[in-house]
Curated annotation (Swiss-Prot):
This is Catalase-peroxidase. Homodimer or homotetramer. The record marks 119 as: Transition state stabilizer. Bifunctional enzyme with both catalase and broad-spectrum peroxidase activity. There is a cross-link at residues 244-270 (Tryptophyl-tyrosyl-methioninium (Tyr-Met) (with W-122)). The gene is katG. The active site is at 123 (proton acceptor). GO terms for cellular component: cytosol. Coiled coil: none annotated. The lineage of its organism: Bacteria, Pseudomonadati, Pseudomonadota, Gammaproteobacteria, Alteromonadales. It catalyses: H2O2 + AH2 = A + 2 H2O; 2 H2O2 = O2 + 2 H2O. Belongs to the peroxidase family. Peroxidase/catalase subfamily.
Length: 766
């Protein structure tokens, strides 16, 4: 779905909201104002995609995004090297100076931009979701639509403009992705909070990610509940255009307990438990304020994506009063949570738990809460008007922490122990802002916490010498002599390496977690096959390591990859093509204690077309769409996806040993029969009673020759895929096919080897 196609809407009863605010975390977003340009219409002379005419046609564009040709820095740019030239202390000093240097065109609340930048950081990182790893701060995606124009990101375009002089000063050495996270972290430190550190390494993207943000076609709509009211997979937010939930309550209903349910779901889907959730909400709402001085529909013009050229990328032009300062309109909610909005205190928890609250409405008409004790209504200084006093406020979502029994226990504990509260928030903030960065080895800078967190999927450093190419060659021979079959070795190597997700850089072959729970028991991985291969390879590992006297060892992770390479070399040779499959050793083995079973369970494939595996109950898209999704997560191009699937079919790598798509009489050899057969006009395909299976019959005799699934037949049906398939079906394509397969296979085996790449950016590996 093209999220840039917004339908024109007026202000609805729902004033768009999530869990923070301009001043804090996530609350300052707005309803789509009258006059917004995002209409979802096609402009004159605009070319129409094939999906416009045939919506069910497979969209391959995710496999063509983030091309290096979009990168003005060039494919050889080394961000890690550029970042190393930074004086990070000087960058922080520059940010600190900016924080208290208020600009007339966008004055700082309470004289400090810290809360504003905290919200920027939160919303940059807060789109991350665990189910598919998409979203997050890596890439600096908030610079681009649709995120740039989401209602929840209202006025954050100004935050980035405030930071532009710093970005301009440091140029390519400081990415927008890093700067947006660093600004909020420094903002906290400026206001007296002791953070847990900061790591650079977020390489900038140069175009928006293609992400499914929900089924809705209007901003702030919510049509994403499945059976039993569960939030549709893989989404994390409850409304289109929001980071998390509606702070006024579920679909605008001021129900704190209902809000608690939504909060628990949304935060769990961004990898946060109850304690982290309370720490983040309470800690974030300690700072700053929300903005609803006027009704958005009466004041605001179009979001950035719909604004005129003269606005130069800025949106939400405010035509009421000053247009900023005390007239600022963002979410429609208005006010600060604490009496000291630019200081780290426990006042948020004191206010929340200690006061009784009554429902009211902001000047914009949004539902919010103020203390029943009216003597408190003059306890909060105004952000801009000297001498004016206001009441502290809470949202319905804030009150969820008071009324939900589990959240309240945590909040009371934090209030009683400020040190525990501070530590919990510091760790949760670091996790929030670094969760999508992948392994710790990608981190840059001198402010990285020494502590290893289990959510970083730690892999130990080798305390031994790495094996040589000569050792690899010998081990290949030993593995082939071990009695393990080509299919067993290929399946296990693929199962381990293909767990990689480019979206959040989790999974992969390193760590040999295929030999640990939960991965060993995943249905798609054929647990019995994995156990047999792992057991045999461990025998070889023990034998090899016991014979070495030079402190040289081989890891199980390397052995699994070596085994797959050996199997492919044999399969290619059996097909008449001699080839060497490269292996770069250096992987190490994680332990079960270093593996968060619940967290890793989210990586379990619900579909893997390369193994002809599809779980209809768990998958949220069609088999062919899941094929593209899987290929996208593996950073494959269209040709790489094509050659890998065809080769794996000939190798007999299907889960469960099914024959669907195995269009060859020479199973276990690396041949191009899949493509030759699929394009053979002597074979006619027809549906069966099982909608997921097709039969290929001899066009002359009617004899059933093969069976296939949608992910097999799409390579002959889709015109783009057929064009590529033809190349591999040529009479002289045997060698090209094998060489291309080996290249694509090796790419998958090394996707998580960031030590072998300088760009740090998996997205640009295409």
């Amino acid at each position: 779905m093209n999220m840039n196609r917004f339908r024109k809407t007026t202000l609805s009863a729902l004033v768009a909201l999530s869990l923070g605010a301009t001043g804090a975390i996530a609350n300052d977003q707005i309803s789509k104002p009258a006059g917004a340009k995002g209409t979802g219409m096609t402009k004159a002379f605009q070319p129409k995609s094939n999906q416009f005419w045939w919506p069910d046609q497979l969209d391959l564009s995710p496999l063509r995004d983030h091309d290096n040709r979009s990168n003005p820095l060039g494919e050889d740019f080394d961000y890690a090297k550029a970042f190393s030239k930074l004086d990070l202390d000087q960058v922080k000093s520059d940010i600190n100076e900016l924080l208290t240097t208020s600009q007339d065109w966008w004055p700082a609340d309470f004289g400090n931009y810290g809360p504003f930048f905290i919200r920027l950081s939160w919303h940059s990182a807060g789109t991350y979701r665990t189910l598919d790893g998409r979203g997050g701060g890596d890439g600096g995606q908030m610079r681009f639509d649709p995120l740039n124009s989401w209602p929840d990101n209202g006025n954050l375009d100004k935050a980035r403009r405030l930071l532009w002089p710093i970005k301009q000063k440091y140029g390519e050495s400081l990415s927008w992705g890093d700067l947006m996270i660093l600004a909020g972290t420094v903002g906290m430190e400026n206001m007296g909070f002791d953070t847990y550190g900061f790591a650079g390494g977020r390489t900038d993207d140069w175009e928006p990610d293609m992400v499914y943000w929900g089924p809705e076609v209007e901003m702030l709509a919510s049509d994403r509940e499945e059976r039993e009211g569960k939030l549709q997979r893989p989404l994390g937010a409850t409304h289109m255009g929001l980071i998390y939930v509606n702070p006024e309550g579920p679909k605008g209903v001021p129900d704190p307990m209902g809000s608690a349910k939504n909060i628990r779901t949304a935060f769990a889907r961004m990898a946060m438990n109850d304690e982290e959730t309370v720490a983040l909400i309470a800690g974030g709402h300690t700072f700053g304020k929300m903005h609803g001085a006027h009704k958005p529909a009466d004041c605001l013009e179009a979001e950035p994506g719909g604004a005129g050229l003269e606005e130069q990328g800025l949106g939400w032009k405010n035509n009421c009063g000053k247009g900023n300062a005390e007239d600022t309109v963002t979410s429609g909610l208005e006010g600060a949570w604490t009496q000291l909005p630019t200081k780290w205190t426990s006042l948020y928890l004191q206010n929340l738990l200690g006061f009784e609250w009554k429902q009211t409405r902001s000047p914009a008409g949004a539902i919010q809460w103020v203390p029943t004790d009216e003597s408190l209504h003059t306890s909060v200084p105004d952000a801009h008007v000297e001498g004016k006093k206001n009441p502290p406020v809470m949202t319905t979502a804030d009150l969820a922490l008071k009324y939900d029994p589990e959240y309240r226990k945590i909040a009371e504990r934090f209030l009683a122990d400020p040190k525990e509260y501070q530590t919990a928030f510091a760790k949760a903030w670091f996790k929030l802002t670094h969760r999508d960065m992948g392994p710790k080895e990608r981190y840059l800078g001198n402010d990285i916490p020494r502590e290893n967190f289990i959510w970083q999927d730690p892999v130990p450093k080798a305390d031994y010498k790495t094996i040589s190419d000569k050792d690899v060659k010998k081990l290949k021979a030993d593995i082939l002599d071990s009695g393990l079959t080509v299919q067993q070795l290929v399946k296990t190597a693929w199962a381990g390496a293909s767990s990689f997700r480019a979206s959040d850089l989790r999974g992969g072959a390193n760590g040999a977690r295929i030999a640990l729970e939960p991965q060993m028991s995943w249905e798609a991985n054929e647990p019995e096959t994995v156990k047999a291969v792992v057991a045999k390879l461990k025998e070889l590992q023990e034998d090899y390591n016991s014979r070495m006297f030079s402190k040289k060892k081989v890891s199980l992770a390397d052995l699994i990859v070596i085994g797959g390479a050996a199997a492919i070399e044999k399969a290619a040779a059996d097909a008449g093509v001699e080839v060497s499959v490269p292996v770069v050793p250096g992987r190490t083995d994680a332990t079960q204690e270093q593996t968060d079973v619940n967290s890793f369970s989210l990586l379990e494939p619900t579909a893997d077309a390369f193994r002809n595996y599809y779980n209809a109950e768990a998958s949220y898209r069609s088999p062919t769409d899941m094929l593209v999704d899987k290929a996208d997560q593996l950073n494959l191009t269209v040709p790489e996806m094509t050659v890998l699937l065809g080769g794996l079919r000939s190798l007999g790598a299907n889960t469960g040993g099914t024959n669907h798509g195995v269009f060859t009489d020479n199973v276990g050899t690396l041949n191009n029969d899949f493509f030759v057969t699929l394009l053979d006009m002597g074979v006619k395909w027809r549906k069966t009673d099982d909608a997921s299976v097709y039969e290929g019959v001899n066009r002359s005799t009617g004899e059933v020759m093969y069976t296939g699934t949608p992910v097999d037949l799409v390579f002959g049906s889709n015109s783009e895929l057929r064009a590529v398939a033809e190349v591999y079906a040529y009479d002289n394509a045997k060698t090209r096919f094998v060489e291309d397969f080996v290249d694509a296979w090796t790419k998958v085996m090394t996707l998580d080897r960031f030590d072998l790449r300088h760009d740090l950016n998996a997205k640009l590996a295409k």
